[in-house]
Amino acid sequence: MYIAGVMSGTSLDGIDVALVRIEGSGVESKVELIHFTTVPFCNDIKSEIQQALSIENSNVQLICSLNFKLGLCFANAVKEVCKEANFSLEQLDLIGSHGQTIYHQPKQDGNRIPSTLQIGEPAVIAYETNTTVISNFRTMDMAAGGQGAPLVPYSEVILYRDPSKNRLLQNIGGISNVTVIPNQQSDQNVIAFDTGPGNMIIDEVCQRLFQLPYDQNGEIAKQGRVVNEILTYCMSHQFLKMNPPKSTGREQFGEKFVSELLKRFEKHSKENILTTVTMFTANSIVHHYKKFILPYYEIDEVILGGGGSYNSTLVEMLRNGLKDENCAIFIQEDIGYSSEAKEAIAFAILANETHHCNPSNVPSATGAKQSVVLGNITFPPV
C-alpha cells in the first residue's frame, strides 16, 4: 500500500508529510520511505494556530474555521509530496493524518475529564485528495483509559527492534518523548513516556529574545553559560516528579511557562537564558533515564530523532549527561533513517494498522486498559 503520513507537531514548524510504501502489517511490516517533505505554514495560518492554542485569546469560531482551513492545508501538503516524488495522487491508497493538537489534557482536573483535541478536518482532506483518510488517532486510547500519548512506540518497535541490542528511541520535537525497545530475545516490556520539553521552550525563548524562529545548530546556546538558579527552577517542575506513564504539552511548557521564567530571571543575559533552557531539555531527558529506565534496563544505544537532534549544543549536553552510562548515542541519520520524517512515517504505519483492523496503541506506554484500534476512517466521495 502507498500511504501518506501527515504530521503537524507542537513546534509549529510546518506540515511534515512522508510518502511511504508498506507491505503487510504488524511486526512483519516492510516499510519504505519514498519521499519526505515539510510544507511551511503561511504566516496567517501559523498566527491563527498560535491564537487557537491560547486559552486567553482563543474562541470557538476561530477553532471551527481553522479546523477546515487546516484540512485544506493538509490536503495540499499531500499533493505537494506526491508532486515532488513524481508520484500520481491516484495511486495513493491511504492518508494517516495526526492533525494539529489544540489542547491535550491527559489527566482529570477538577470536573474536566481527560480529553484531547486535534483539528484538520479529515472530510476536507478526503474530498480534496479523493483518498481515504484515517485521523483522530489519540481518542480511542483515551477512551480506554490511556493518556492518548505517546503513540509512536508501536511504529518504533516495527522499525527499530534489534536482535540483540536494547535501544532507547528519543524524539526531541516540541515535546520530548522516549521509547524503550528491548531486544528481540528479551521478555521485558516496551515502555514509553514524555520526558518534558524538547524544542518548545528553546524556540519560544529564541523568538522573544532574539527574534529568531529557533537556535540553528545550537549556535547561540554555545555562546552562553548555564545559570544554576534558572536550571534549578526549571528542574523543580512538577512534571519531572511524576511517574510514567505520563504525557505533557504546551499547557505545561508553552508561552505561560516562558513568560514566568523570563519575568523571574530578567536580570540575566539572553544568551545565558537560552543556554540554560537548552540544558533544561537535556537534563530533563537524562533525569528520566536515570530514574525510570537505567535501573531496570541495560541500554546499548540511544537513537535521537526530531528537530532537536540537529541542535549540536543540545546533543553535546546529552552526551555529557550520559557519559558514565556506557551507551552509544546516535542520531537517526547515523543508522540510515531521517530525524525529520520519523513522526510522519509513524502515522503512516498507524494508518496501515487501522486499515488492517489491528490495535496499535501500547498500553504499557499510554496507560490504557487494553490494546485498541486507533483512529476514525473518513471515506472519499463516491
Swiss-Prot record:
The enzyme's main class, written as a single word, is transferase
List the SUPFAM superfamilies: Actin-like ATPase domain
Q: Which Gene3D superfamilies match?
A: 3.30.420.40
Q: Which Pfam families match?
A: AnmK
The chain's coiled-coil residues are none
Q: Which domain of life is it from?
A: Bacteria
GO MF terms, alphabetically ordered: ATP binding; kinase activity; phosphotransferase activity, alcohol group as acceptor
Q: In which pathway does it act?
A: Amino-sugar metabolism; 1,6-anhydro-N-acetylmuramate degradation; Cell wall biogenesis; peptidoglycan recycling
Catalysed reaction equations from the record: 1,6-anhydro-N-acetyl-beta-muramate + ATP + H2O = N-acetyl-D-muramate 6-phosphate + ADP + H(+)
- Note whether ATP-binding occurs among the keywords: yes
Q: Where does ATP bind?
A: 9-16
Q: What are the recorded Gene Ontology BP terms?
A: 1,6-anhydro-N-acetyl-beta-muramic acid catabolic process; amino sugar metabolic process; peptidoglycan turnover
What's the EC number here?
A: 2.7.1.170
Keyword annotations for this protein, in alphabetical order, are: ATP-binding, Carbohydrate metabolism, Kinase, Nucleotide-binding, Transferase
- Provide the family line: Belongs to the anhydro-N-acetylmuramic acid kinase family.
What functional role does this protein have? Answer: Catalyzes the specific phosphorylation of 1,6-anhydro-N-acetylmuramic acid (anhMurNAc) with the simultaneous cleavage of the 1,6-anhydro ring, generating MurNAc-6-P. Is required for the utilization of anhMurNAc either imported from the medium or derived from its own cell wall murein, and thus plays a role in cell wall recycling.
Which PANTHER family would you find in this protein's record? Answer: ANHYDRO-N-ACETYLMURAMIC ACID KINASE
Name by which UniProt lists this protein: Anhydro-N-acetylmuramic acid kinase
**Source organism:** Bacillus cereus (strain 03BB102)
